[in-house]
């Protein structure tokens, strides 16, 4: 079941190198490349017009100069917002990327990506279809460069229908005793788990299923070392350079 996915170093830049640059922006992803990180993670949701964009929150308030719900605005408007000044004046003028822009960046750099499908309420399937329409124009269905993940089982079901050979991961924030049943049904090659709910027994349980085990969000090198010693394959981190230094 384990896919032909390799993590060297075993760290994934969470929303890019988001401790060093504003999360889910091209500057954060470029910073990851500059640090020698091979994998990034980012979130995909839909703007009000249906364009898939790279953004995490349902609202604009935390990470942009805008206010209100993402779903209320077209991408043409969202593109005018400042997505960097909240982090540092050095990043003033940073824009919200589209998934298309990100896909082109992945092709140009060879960077690998964990693409988290993060649908707004009621958009589980719609988000997958829009995201797949973009990604399939740039990558083969079974590309080892791309791992799709989601907390949304309906989204994963939709993706499996659209792309039978795509590499998928089930995200778990709280422990779900039915995780194996879900993973087998959806043919997930990886389980991506909140580090706070992991212990050696649960790590063994997942690894015994012959799947990859990724853990988030790990910013402490000592904690990363512990997780690796238990058998975790890679960790998501806001400061991937610090984790990679100890790998």
For the regions a protein language model found, what residue spans apply to each?
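Phosphate-group recognition and catalysis centered on beta-loop-alpha active-site segments
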Residues: 1-247
């Amino acid at each position: 079941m384990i896919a032909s996915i390799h993590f060297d170093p075993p760290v994934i830049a969470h929303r890019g190198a988001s401790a060093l640059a504003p999360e889910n922006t091209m500057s954060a992803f470029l910073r990851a490349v500059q640090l020698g990180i091979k994998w990034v993670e980012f979130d995909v949701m839909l703007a009000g017009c249906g364009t898939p964009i790279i953004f995490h929150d349902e609202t604009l308030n935390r990470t942009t100069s805008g206010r209100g719900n993402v779903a209320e605005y077209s991408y043409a408007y969202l593109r005018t917002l400042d997505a960097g000044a909240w982090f540092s004046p050095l990043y003033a003028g940073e824009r919200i990327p589209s998934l298309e822009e990100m896909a082109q960046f992945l092709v140009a750099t060879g960077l690998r990506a964990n693409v988290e499908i993060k649908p707004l309420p009621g958009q589980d399937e719609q988000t997958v279809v829009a995201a797949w329409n973009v990604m399939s124009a740039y990558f083969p269905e079974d590309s080892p460069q791309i791992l799709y993940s989601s907390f949304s089982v309906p989204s994963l079901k939709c993706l499996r229908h659209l792309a039978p050979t795509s590499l998928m991961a089930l995200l778990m924030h709280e422990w779900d005793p039915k995780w194996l049943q879900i993973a087998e049904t959806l043919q997930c090659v990886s389980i991506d788990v909140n580090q706070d709910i992991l212990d050696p027994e649960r790590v063994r349980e997942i690894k015994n299923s012959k799947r990859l085990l990724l853990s988030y969000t790990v910013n402490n090198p000592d904690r990363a070392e512990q997780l690796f010693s238990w058998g975790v394959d890679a960790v998501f981190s806001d400061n991937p350079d610090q984790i990679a230094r100890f790998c």
